[in-house]
Amino acid sequence: MLSLQTLAKKVVACNYLSSDYDYTLQRFGLWWDLGPIHLCNTCKQIFSYKHLQCFSEDDLCLEAALVKAVKSDNLELIRLFVDWGANPEYGLIRVPAVHLKRLCMELGGLTPVSESRLLEILKEVADLKSCAGVLLGYDMFCHNPLLETVTRTTLDTVMYTRSKIPLTGDTAHLLLSKFWFALALRHNFTKAIHYFYEKHKNQLYWRLTCSLYFNNIFDLHELCCKKEICISPNLMMKFACLREENYAAIYYCHMLGASLDYGMNLSIYNNNTLNLFFCIDLGATNFDRARLIARRVYMYNLSNLFLVKQLFSRDVSLILDLTEPQAIYDMLNTYTSKNLKQAEEYFTAHPEIVVID
């Protein structure tokens, strides 16, 4: 149960007060850095009055606020955030000074933090899906000696289930850095992306790979404008075609000069039918080569379909000279494949060409 003082602080923090009350808020312990603390009663995010709406990239969940308070050795705020609902175990993950560790234990944290609980917290932070959460995860787990007892296989499995992209790295630190970077790119958390890239300039290739894999053409466009694209358009197309429905990334690669026929062939190899027909809708035409590849990978129905070349044509509703990411996303927002629909209708009308496995 919250004490009367803690409850009063929570009520005050959940309401906006004019700057006339700044001195009172400082004395009341509701001041952090250069401004008063605000707690959103709905989403439980902590943010300053300078951001008068939730879900900005500067918001902090209670756990992230706790870790920041631990790092700054602010005992008053540590107690306050735990009273408001922050999990004191998050303060222990940072392996802070003895007096801070003792305080987190007094407030309910268990030490030592077990391996299973450590991995649960890693998952919880990854599932926050916020810029602050990604930065929190990087801060808590990279260079963290508590992870030395976790097997590489276990760590790989946990990170793959959260990031949905294969990760490689010689060390746990490199692996975790790429993991949090990938999450930032997946959700286009620009503040986190710039933070990671500033610290890991050698990870440009990984940044490109993730942006293509996660269909994030906002980041691709930024790199393109800065002339930091370091690989060929066709290699970019290879990464874009790894994941189904990566229409924006495929489109952007084509605008940079990647071959649509190459994209179509890659999509056949990857068994990504929707990407395949998107390439045809954009203008892929080398169906002889595509038919041979389809037969090689045992996609006989598709191979038979490519014999009917006159069935396919470019979808003229797809504008081919867009370069602004938002315009591309807007155009593709209502996209459905014209050629896929025609292929389905052809199979229905000609069941004799259908090969049943």
Curated annotation (Swiss-Prot):
Coiled-coil stretches noted in the UniProt entry, renumbered to this chain: none
GO CC terms, sorted: host cell cytoplasm
Keywords from the named record: Host cytoplasm, Host-virus interaction, Inhibition of host innate immune response by virus, Inhibition of host IRF3 by virus, Inhibition of host RLR pathway by virus, Viral immunoevasion
Keyword Magnesium included in the entry's annotation: no
Domain of life of the source: Viruses
Signal peptide segment: none
GO biological process, one term: symbiont-mediated suppression of host cytoplasmic pattern recognition receptor signaling pathway via inhibition of IRF3 activity
InterPro entries: ASFV_MGF360 (IPR002595)
Pfam families: ASFV_360
Keyword Cell cycle: no
Compartments reported by the entry: Host cytoplasm
Quaternary data: Interacts with host IRF3 and TRIM21; these interactions mediates degradation of IRF3 through TRIM21 and ubiquitin-meditated proteolysis.
Protein family per UniProt: Belongs to the asfivirus MGF 360 family.
Function, as annotated: Plays a role in virus cell tropism, and may be required for efficient virus replication in macrophages. Also inhibits the host cGAS/STING-mediated type I interferon production by inducing host IRF3 degradation through the proteasome pathway.
Protein name per Swiss-Prot or TrEMBL: Protein MGF 360-14L
Organism this protein belongs to: African swine fever virus (isolate Tick/Malawi/Lil 20-1/1983) (ASFV)
